[in-house]
Amino acid sequence: MVSLRDWNYEQRSGLGGSGAWALLNGEDGVEAELDLGVGWQDPAVIRESGFCVWRSGHLPVLDFKQSGEMLAGRMAIYWTGIEHDTPSNTDLKRDYDLIEKAGKIAQQAVHARDFDMLAKAVATSYEVQLGEGMQELVAVEGAVANKYCGGGHGGYALYMFNDQTARDAAVAANEPMRPIEPYCR
């Protein structure tokens, strides 16, 4: 959790900070993000919480939500040491077919509560990111999938593990890594 006084994550890092900052200041997070030209996903996810599938479009439409329990003990974020600036990357050439494929795999994984399928979706998304010129992420022992968070090109990266033992071992072995857990109110 973050507040205006307690922000214990790096800024400009891909964790939805600009959307969160707008919400904490009483602004409409979706409008604030759209004004930056970066999309509505972060403030919509923050406002809704949980493990969500959203319909693509100009404004957020929630398709499906669950608690995310299948992710408990299986995720960590890794600080790459490089800030990123999503608005400066919005004009990059994108592989929309591969992005759509990753999204469809993720949607099916959430509906089926299938961790392995979700890891495949994350790996497909990472393939898109590499195609957009992002640097390869650090290999972490025990990780089954990883990708940059947010707009990528730096910031935090998500790493997924088969179980909490593997995740906790990776966190202990990698100083810039911290465990994260799903949150649903």
Model-found features: residue ranges?
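Conserved active-site tyrosine of GNAT-family acetyltransferases
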Residues: 22
